[in-house]
Amino acid sequence: MKGQRIRIKLQGFDYRVIDQSALEIVETAKRSGARVSGPIPLPTRVEKLSVNRSPHVDKKSMEQFETRTHKRLIDIIEPTAQTVDELKKLNLPSGVDITINV
């Protein structure tokens, strides 16, 4: 697979799980003989939500919630057939969303 590149994007709410998954992917790719670039941390998306504490008089009293979506990017440069097979067999945690582009 000369000249090809596999781009893996990881997303999740817990950065520790994402970093652990990224480390597993990098180790698997290096073991199979491919070059790896990353994991590259991408900007964290923060969504904030403000909700009234009381449905009646206290309009100024609001409670704030936020969700943080952490992202990592891994490029596998010149993957071999063994690399693709090993990545298919890899078992990753359920808190990680994985997008793969070839």
Curated annotation (Swiss-Prot):
| GO terms of molecular function | structural constituent of ribosome; tRNA binding
Q: Name one Pfam family in it.
A: Ribosomal_S10
Q: Write out the entry's keywords from A to Z.
A: Ribonucleoprotein, Ribosomal protein
Please give the biological process terms from Gene Ontology that the record holds. translation
A single GO cellular-component term from the record reads: ribonucleoprotein complex
Q: Function, please?
A: Involved in the binding of tRNA to the ribosomes.
How does this chain assemble?
A: Part of the 30S ribosomal subunit.
Q: Which HAMAP family match?
A: Ribosomal_uS10 (MF_00508)
Family, according to the entry, reads as follows:
Belongs to the universal ribosomal protein uS10 family.
Protein name listed in UniProt:
Small ribosomal subunit protein uS10
* UniProt source species: Opitutus terrae (strain DSM 11246 / JCM 15787 / PB90-1)
Q: Which gene encodes it?
A: rpsJ
